[in-house]
Each structure stands twice: as C-alpha cells, then as structure tokens.
Amino acid sequence: MARQLSRKVPLAELHCHLGGAVTPAIMWSIAHAQGIKLPTRDYWEFRDTITVSDKRNRSFDGYLQLFHWTELIQSSPIAVERAVYEVVGGAYRKNNVTTTELRFNPMKRNRGGEQDLDHIIAAAARGMDRASLEYPVKPGLIFCLDRAFPFELNEIIVEKAIAWRDRGVVGVDIAGPESATFRVADYRRLFRRARQYGLGLTVHTGESGPVDEVARVVELLEPDRIGHGVKAAYDPRAMAMIRERGIVLEICPSSNLNTRVVSGWEEFRWIFDQFRRNEVRFTINTDGPEMLKTYIRDEMASLGRYGILSVEDQEQAAATSLAASFVPNVSDVPAARMEPATRVAVEREEA
C-alpha cells in the first residue's frame, strides 16, 4: 500500500524562511562574490556552519544561531535577488512546488541600515520575477516582524509590506524567540491595518513559547494562519478557536524535532491525531529546506513512513496549502510536465 504522496501532485510551501532555504553551495558563492569574511575557508566546514548537524546540540536557540551567517550573507540587493530566485526555481525543479511563500525580515538584510530597505525589497521582487519567467510558479513574500525589535521598527516593516503589496508581498508574520518586551496586544492595531490592505496574517506561536499564547494570539491578532502551532494540540480551547475561525496551521515536522519542541515521531502521532479529532486544518512545510536538509516531500514521506499521515491525509494537507496560500490565483499554475529530481540527484549536483 502506498504511503507517500505522488511526486506529480503540485505543492505549496507556506512556511519557508529565506535564511534557511538557499543551498550552501550558492551561499558560498554569494559570500565570495561580496567579499564577506567567512569563519572558515573550507567549504565543507562552512556548510556545517549553516546547516543542522549531529555535531551541534539540538535546541531552539541553537537553531536560531544558524541564521547569523545566512542573514549576513544575504544582506545586499544582489544577494537577496539571487537567493529568492534560486529558492523559488529550486523548489519547483526539486519538488514540483508551484507556490512558494518566502518569509524574511528585510531589516535583517540591510546591514543595520547601511543598505536601503526599499532596494532590498525591490531585489526580492526581481528574484521572484526571474523565477516566474523561467518556471510555472506563483511565489510570494511574507515580511517577518521580530519579537525582539522595538515596536517602531516592526511598524516600519508592516508599512513596507503595505507599500510593496502590488509587487509580490502577500503577508506579514511575527517571528523570533520569546522577549520580555514583546506584548501580543500591542500589535493588534498593526495587524488590523495590514488586513485592511489585503495582506495575509500569520504568527509564529505554539512553538517555543507557552501553550496559552496560541489562544491569546488567535483572540487578539486574528491571524489567517499560525506558524508551527504544535502546542495548540495541548489546549482544547485553542483548537476550538482555530477550528471555528478557519485558521490553518503551518506544521514543520523536522524543524520541531531538531529544536526539540516535539520530542519524537510518537509525539507527532499524538499531535496530528488531536488535530484530526478536533478538525484543525494543517499544512506540511520545511521551515528551511537547505538548513534542515529536508524537502517538503521528505516531510510528507516521513509522516507516511511512520504511519502518522495516510496518503489521503497528505493529499488533504497539500490541497489545504494551496487553498490557504496568501498568493492569489495559485490554482492557475499548470502541473509539472516531468517528475522532480530525487534528493540524491540534487545532492550530487550541489557537490
């Protein structure tokens, strides 16, 4: 009996961070093209620096530290354009991902103000345009606010998202680890403003923070989707609110295992069982395919192999991803003419 989704089924990746989505070989090339001083001159050591590894302790903080170098390397218009172009095109070639929503914080790509923010955003839009000319894809950008940022900086990010909404910016997000200065209620007005201008709303919650934050985010910010959200399975009230409001979860299995937010596949089995029982809609994503060394079909395959999601469940998750995408008219994208490359073939190409 088949346990894996057909590779011909088109997919939408809704939760993918630009800092974790570019192959190490391309990151190496971008860094050298800009003359960035790297922590090592050895490519293989560099690859280990920006990807998960058994040599590194698995933790939420450890995972976030990987983004130090990737965000620095991507901090110029030229770097951002190439990064976005490579991710969108690569996702289609490797996994038949026809809709990629790439999220990033533009203020973490402008070297603390040295680079003009609008030039960074324009470069990301050009990267999407190039990929869309070459492949039958419909990408979009989500701008991440940061819990550690002062409100004034996050407000600027929302205003930039509104200003660039006609050039492929489709939503806003709140990301980053817990911060003593961050209050969900402070962002209610900002999120309402973003919604008024047609932007999709998603929030990282139910991951590293407290279980009760999920319900608080749903109540105060009224998001369309929730990034990760696995801890909602432990809160019946949160699941009821999510179901009643039609909110969709962006589940990233390998990421949650790597950060130890979820202890193992057996806990995931229980989590998905709770979501199905409570009619909570969910999608499957990578969080960062190259950083985590996994593609979206790898995630689906693992859930099928462990008997957590049936092929029908996987097909439903894929359909939900397309339906819940912030990118307009994603159903207009034609299906792939050939099957995507296997993971082995891609790794050989990179090496």
PLM-predicted stretches and their roles:
Residues M1-L199, E207-R225, K231-V248, P253-A351:
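Metal-cofactor-binding active-site regions of metalloenzymes
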